[in-house]
From Swiss-Prot:
The keyword Cytoplasm does not apply. InterPro entries: Ser_inhib-like_sf (IPR036084), SerProtInhib-TIL_Domain (IPR051368), TIL_dom (IPR002919). Keywords: Disulfide bond, Protease inhibitor, Secreted, Serine protease inhibitor. Pfam families: TIL. Its main location: secreted. The keyword Signal does not apply. It is found in: Secreted. This is Chymotrypsin inhibitor.
């Protein structure tokens, strides 16, 4: 699968990945999900792009 900038494909990524709105990793009991996730150190913004925290 093609991923966007600053993303990586993960076969078992967190279903509760950190975002600009919720930057702290939260306790997650949901199953892992297959798909593109932000690279380490990046957060998903409101438009769905992976950005550095200072660009949120």
């Amino acid at each position: 699968e093609e991923c966007g900038p600053n993303e990586v494909f993960n076969t078992c990524g967190s279903a509760c990945a950190p975002t600009c709105a919720q930057p702290k990793t939260r306790i997650c009991t949901m199953q892992c999900r297959i798909g593109c996730q932000c690279q380490e150190g990046f957060l998903r913004n409101g438009e769905g792009a992976c950005v550095l925290p200072e660009n949120c």
